[in-house]
């Protein structure tokens, strides 16, 4: 059911290959700090796709998720909204209403990026302390991260604006 929801919401980015192509297109049109952040998001997206497509267990990718570019840009007070100068806010689209991403409607790019990296850091912290905790559904956590990354990609490509 969760994968069906993903397919419905993100049919334009419904595979690792199409997401990689979308990142490639965005990377070609961005330079400097924006490109650095997009490269990091691309890597994190690739890792989450491995879990979504059931190729690897979350335990193998969680330690590999990276936040270095984000952390550096955050320390420099980078304006993450510059990734999308024309489309600042997530539009109210029917495909988002009633979904677990509905809370992002009306949020700006910086808020979506912050939520992505907050999820990564939280997941890595909890995983580092108690990786074998059976009460934590690591697949669901990675899937939720994956959906946020795809939401950002769709917005940056203009699909949700």
Language model regions located:
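Short, cationic, amphipathic peptide segments
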Residues: 1-27
